[in-house]
Curated annotation (Swiss-Prot):
It is an enzyme of class 4 (lyase). It comes from Chloroherpeton thalassium (strain ATCC 35110 / GB-78). Binds 1 pyruvoyl group covalently per subunit. InterPro entries: Asp_de-COase-like_dom_sf (IPR009010), Asp_decarbox (IPR003190). The lineage of its organism: Bacteria, Pseudomonadati, Chlorobiota, Chlorobiia, Chlorobiales. This is Aspartate 1-decarboxylase.
Length: 136
């Protein structure tokens, strides 16, 4: 039996743009995609902290270092520019593998620059995770 387990997330990202007439998806800065262990075309769940909306879509490559978080197509109706969102991926795992799995969390600032990256379970709260400056 396989379980659907939380794999990774980009936490507290800010929506930078919305394009209702573009094919449905979410465009994400590839630096953030890589840091979170996500991939282009991967299915994601998006949670809007401002209005409570939750929806699924897939990742499109955004320009590296741009901080782009753009909702496209129908998803553009579920968030406004400036809204805070969480972008989550899941993976299928056998129960034994899932027991030891530690999801990746990428915390970003208001401009979608990474502040902290950590494996959930290494720290009890995001506040205890070292910042990127502390890791180097």
């Amino acid at each position: 039996m396989k379980l659907h387990i939380f794999k990774s997330k980009i936490h507290r990202a800010t929506v930078t743009n919305a394009d209702l007439y573009y094919e449905g998806s979410i465009t994400i800065d590839m630096d953030l995609v890589d840091l979170a262990g996500m991939m282009p075309n991967e299915k994601v769940q998006v949670v809007n902290n401002n209005n409570g909306a939750r929806f699924e879509t897939y990742i499109i490559r955004g320009k590296r270092g741009s901080g782009t978080i753009q909702l496209n197509g129908a998803a553009a109706r579920l968030a406004s520019i400036g809204d805070e969102i969480i972008i989550i991926t899941y993976a299928e795992m056998e129960p034994e593998e899932a027991k030891d799995y530690k999801p990746t969390v990428v915390l970003v600032d208001k401009k979608n620059r990474p502040k902290k990256i950590f494996q959930l379970g290494e720290e009890t709260t995001p506040e205890e995770a070292p910042s990127l400056e502390q890791r180097n």
